[in-house]
């Protein structure tokens, strides 16, 4: 079978989707898949996922409403960074709006995608160096998470047909 090697380095909600979507899609196609979670991506291996999204500093992020009349939902709400940085709770609002929009569109949650990956035998490899730097222990993560260093991932990735850094 083909082999996919992914590196997941970010733990925000918007960056949590790509490795799990690609991993589960490749797994469903019968590919071998390994995802190496390093730096902030390592938090995606925790039992309770708390990934949030911040539109601050992300001008490409559309702010659309997941409710209301269709015309209202289709408005691109341009929010200046100054407003987003100074309004308490704005990150929480953006996170909830994104989750609701994904739900309305039938997109699986991060938890569901991670579970699908596990069901298909996708290897979820946590970076040992990142664990050491941030003070994590193996018991901080889901039991299915493998722990390995860069060499562990490179050995896997060397034989991969597709390698992506996300």
Language model regions located:
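Short, basic, glycine/proline-bearing loop/turn elements
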Residues: 5-10, 93-102, 136-139
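Short, glycine-rich nucleotide/cofactor-binding loops
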Residues: 6-16, 45
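Histidine-anchored nucleotide/phosphate-binding helix
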Residues: 16-30, 35
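Short internal beta-strands
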Residues: 33-39, 125-128
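N-terminal beta-loop-helix "entrance" segment that forms/cooperates
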Residues: 41-55
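A glycine-rich helix N-cap at a beta->alpha junction
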Residues: 53-93, 106
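Glycine-rich, aromatic-bearing surface loops/beta-hairpins
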Residues: 126, 139-166
């Amino acid at each position: 079978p083909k082999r996919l090697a992914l590196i997941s380095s970010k733990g925000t909600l918007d960056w949590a989707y790509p490795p799990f979507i690609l991993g589960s899609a490749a797994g469903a196609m019968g590919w071998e898949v390994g995802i190496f979670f390093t730096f902030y991506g390592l938090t995606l291996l925790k039992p309770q996922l708390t990934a949030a999204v911040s539109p601050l500093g992300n001008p490409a992020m559309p702010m659309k409403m997941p409710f209301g009349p269709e015309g209202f939902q289709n408005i691109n709400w341009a929010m200046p960074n100054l407003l987003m940085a100074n309004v308490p709770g704005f990150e929480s609002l953006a996170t909830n709006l994104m989750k609701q929009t994904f739900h309305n569109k039938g997109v699986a949650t991060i938890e569901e995608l991670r579970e699908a990956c596990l069901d298909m035998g996708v290897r979820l490899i946590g970076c040992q160096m990142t664990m050491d730097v941030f003070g994590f222990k193996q018991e901080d993560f889901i039991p299915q998470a493998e722990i390995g260093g860069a060499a562990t991932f490179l050995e896997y990735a060397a034989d991969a047909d597709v390698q992506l850094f996300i």
